[in-house]
Regions:
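TRNA-recognition modules of translation machinery and tRNA-sensing kinases, especially anticodon-binding
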Residues: 26, 130-420
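N-terminal alpha-helical targeting/anchoring segments
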Residues: 1-133, 145
Length: 420
């Protein structure tokens, strides 16, 4: 959530930068500024009236002692009038704050200056590529057919489309990837968290999934709880309403979780097999840092995620997302994609983002600096990595007549070198 200070002091700049995200902010920004003025005017009047009430209250006792009952009664009447006025002013201020908050949560984060102009995925800028795209025979199979051939995935029998059931070596490959990613994160200095898979609305609001992505989240109505779309939500919310010490920063956490997304409106080739699921496994990395260090942290996270896709020997590329493809809460995002040699397309396996102070302002996640001043933290997170499309690319790219070759780094975790 943007701060009132930024909105009121940098109105034109805020409107200009939000236009990069194709968000027309003029009307809502001006409404917020007007409400903030109402709030401040009400507060000023309240403060003045309270000062006067205190002054008159002190006078009343003296007037009574001096026998000036009529003057004391006038002062009492004025105190009563001022208190009644203050009740109205307090109600006006409270309503202005409520209306202002309801508008603030509708405004996306400001994009970083380096975010390219663009309307969608086609305008994202490729920053770097690596790995070798394998040359496969014409009869090479897509991963959903390989899963059937090798009997490693049972499909939609239990829950329906988008909820895969892994079997045998398929299940062991999933577990191997999770353990490999968690071990790598631990070795890189991340502290492992085991989070819940359901959160309350306040947690979803804190990281920005609510209200923006409410329609994409599974909601347990009876308990008013949400299935998590990513471990980012519970892990980042650990630091809600917390004031950290500067010496505690940066905080590095990692977590494995199942993730749940409704993916309403998805259809066609993008949803075949493991391309787009309602439930999937992912390892997440989360960092909390000082504002002046957060972009260094972002670079380190990008480097770390690159090391994972390189270790899996997959062809990869890094995209800097354009304004039109940037998420509601992100200031800058780098997407990692791996190439599917059979589908002939790039598959997203990670997004690494800096949210600057946007989430922290919602969460009230702060730190006390060297001067003992309380400041908003910057929050960052990234997928490290999301499993389904990694599995899809591994199955397709590593298929041979003898079976599917397992990357060397995974063999100690799987206990086998090929699926055959």
């Amino acid at each position: 959530m943007l701060t009132i200070k930024v909105i009121t002091e940098q109105r034109d700049e805020v409107i200009r930068r939000l236009a990069v995200k194709h968000f027309d902010a003029t009307e809502i920004i001006d409404r917020i500024i007007a409400l903030d003025k109402t709030r401040r005017v009400s507060q000023t009047a309240l403060d003045a009236n309270l000062t006067e009430v205190n002054r008159l209250s002190k006078q009343i006792g003296g007037l009574m002692k001096e026998g000036k009952r009529a003057e004391a009664d006038e002062a009492k009447a004025e105190v009563s009038r001022l208190k009644e006025t203050n009740r109205t002013l307090e109600a006006d201020k409270t309503q202005a704050e409520k209306d202002m908050h309801e508008l603030l949560v509708l405004i996306p984060n400001l994009p970083h200056a380096s975010v390219p102009e663009g309307t969608g995925a086609d305008d994202n800028r490729c920053e770097e590529t690596g790995g070798t795209i394998p040359e496969l025979p014409a009869d090479a199979l897509p991963h959903w057919e390989l899963a059937r051939k090798y009997d490693i995935e049972l499909g939609v029998k239990i829950t329906g489309a988008g909820f895969p059931v892994y079997k045998g070596k398929g299940a062991r490959l999933q577990r191997a990837l999770v353990n490999f990613f968690l071990d790598c994160a631990r070795d890189a200095g991340y502290v492992e968290i085991e989070p819940p898979y359901v959160v309350n609305a306040e947690s979803g609001y804190g990281t920005g999934q609510l209200p923006d992505k409410e329609g994409q989240m599974y909601h347990a109505n009876l308990d008013d709880l949400y299935l998590i779309p990513t471990a980012e939500v519970p892990v980042t919310n650990i630091y809600r309403d917390v004031i950290l010490n500067e010496a505690d920063l940066p905080i590095r956490n990692t977590a494995y979780s199942a993730c749940f997304r409704r993916e309403a409106g998805s259809y066609g080739k993008d949803v075949r097999g493991l391309n787009r699921l309602h439930q999937f496994d992912k390892v997440e990395i989360v960092r909390i840092d000082r504002p002046e260090h957060s972009y260094t942290s972002l670079e380190e996270m990008v480097t770390y995620v690159r090391s994972l896709v390189e270790a899996l020997e997959l062809p990869w590329r890094i995209l800097r997302l354009c304004g039109g493809d940037l998420s509601f809460t992100s200031a800058l995002t780098f997407d990692f994609e791996v190439f599917s040699a059979v589908q002939k397309r790039w598959l997203e396996v990670s997004s690494v983002s800096n949210f600057e102070s946007y989430q922290a302002n919602r969460l009230k996640c702060r730190y006390r600096d060297a001067d003992k001043k309380v400041q908003l933290c910057h929050t960052l997170n990234g997928s490290a990595l999301a499993l389904p499309r990694i599995v899809a690319a591994l199955l397709e790219n590593n298929q041979t007549p003898e079976g599917i070759i397992i990357p060397k780094v995974l063999v100690p975790y799987t206990g086998f070198e090929r699926i055959s």
